[in-house]
Amino acid sequence: MDFSTVKSLTIPEGNVIKIMSGNVVLWTKPEEPGPTPSGDLPPSNQVWYEAPAILPEYNLGSPVSHTYDESTKRGVLTYSEDIRQSVDVHYFAFRGTPITKIWWPDCCTSWDGDCMHTCPNLKEIYAGSALHSISDGTCNGGTSPEKIVLYNNENFYANETGLVKKSDNTLYLGTVNLDIRNTPCTTLGSRCMADMHLTDKTLYFPSTMNSSTGDWNIGGETPEPYTIYLPCSTAPNWTLSYIRGIITWHIPATNSGYENWKTHQSDWTFVEDL
């Protein structure tokens, strides 16, 4: 099947369907995997696809079947159980598909950027609660999503002193924006910015970040999210925090972009050494 043009899936009889999260379907084909639209062989016979024309129905105990509802013009999947498996998303997983949005399963722990290679319509990625590693620096071929959205993430949370990590979790930010409005984060840090394909990017802050000075309106009264643009010259080991009403961008004194951004001290509180 040429996934570069298909807009919905008709699941052949005998195939195994697993609804992972939202509309994302894991289609395991019984035959040997063929080449991708680009001619490359995928690493397995699993094809990930967002199928908006397929409506999952949770009918526990029923066999897997696929029907088409003429009244709603939607395909209906009926399957025996909701199977959620631990999975990392890797190279070619979505390659060549016309998807516009990806929901990672809550159990997904990591992904690499080339799993979305040549998906020119991809706009948003929703990352589940178990995610601890994002690498988007290899999203090329017109693929880079516009925004990564974290929701209910249990590996990144914060208290009154800033970001608390359960382990050495890192968000590798490269070419995309990051939406953390649905997380309790009050601090965001990175230790690898200089190694990525950098562009100016936007952080969408959660409602827990509200300024008491009136100079900022972050996640506050306005209907549109407030955005902060980080310069591409930002080096590793910066931390952005909101503590006791003060927004602080901690950057090492050796940061090459530090002098350029001293002019923004009316907007930021600088701490020269972490």
Residue ranges with predicted function:
Residues V24-E31, L173-L178, E259-H264:
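Short, surface-exposed terminal/edge motifs of secreted or surface/virion proteins that either
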Residues S44-L55, D69-V87, R95-S110, C119-S133, ...:
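Structural signature of tandem-repeat unit edges
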Residues M1-P37:
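Enriched but not universal
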Residues P37-S44:
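Beta-strand/beta-sandwich contexts
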Residues L60-S65:
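N-terminal accessory interaction module
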